[in-house]
């Protein structure tokens, strides 16, 4: 994997590095691009939405690494609402939507499925984060079919695959990835780094990809070109500074 798209800084409230430290780690690993995706404001300790609007001040390159501006938003309710205003979307390149227990207390399979389908169809999110969490069971096939229809990526999260966070996710991640492959879904991969030394740690994801023989043309984090092409498919405007990376 060449792109790291799920990273956090101390601004998330429970992470421990700056964006510059994350970029430096990416640079030392030879990663050409990464996205900063701090938690949105409903998460305890997370920043006000102005933090995300103001990402426009960030340079497009830090330590020689291309910087994508993003956010990991919270799925807030059955209607699929997220916790950043619509006006913020235009300042972001990448929005991941995830269930988090402090924001959306787990309900049941039907409720979780309905919320995911609503958020996919809203058109506001580019990917669904760490879906393997057993606390948020859902109809895998129904949700992934909807994601295929709307070109929303399914995240395969390295931290979930370690088995120590969101315990019980490992087998579910494999099943989700298997169905994603069968249905032709795009997947995104990430280490879910909350500390700079975890940038670029994809070993568990790579094992899953190898085990399932997942097609690389459906892994949007395989290269900058593929990731930027996916953003274009999603309707994002081209990023002029990344023109050379898109070829």
UniProtKB/Swiss-Prot annotation:
Enzyme kind, highest EC tier: hydrolase
One example of a Gene Ontology biological process annotation: bacterial-type flagellum-dependent swarming motility
Keywords linked to the UniProt accession: Hydrolase, Metal-binding, Zinc
Positions annotated to bind Zn(2+) 2: 72, 100, 130
Cofactor binding note: Binds 2 Zn(2+) ions per subunit.
Presence of the UniProt keyword Hydrolase in the record: yes
Amino-acid positions noted as binding Zn(2+) 1 in the UniProt annotation, renumbered to this chain: 14, 39, 194
Annotated GO CC locations: cytosol
One Gene Ontology MF term: zinc ion binding
EC number per UniProt: 3.1.3.-
Required co-factors: Zn(2+)
HAMAP family for this protein: YcdX_phosphat (MF_01561)
Family the entry assigns: Belongs to the PHP family.
Protein name, as recorded: Probable phosphatase VSAL_II0887
Organism: Aliivibrio salmonicida (strain LFI1238) (Vibrio salmonicida (strain LFI1238))
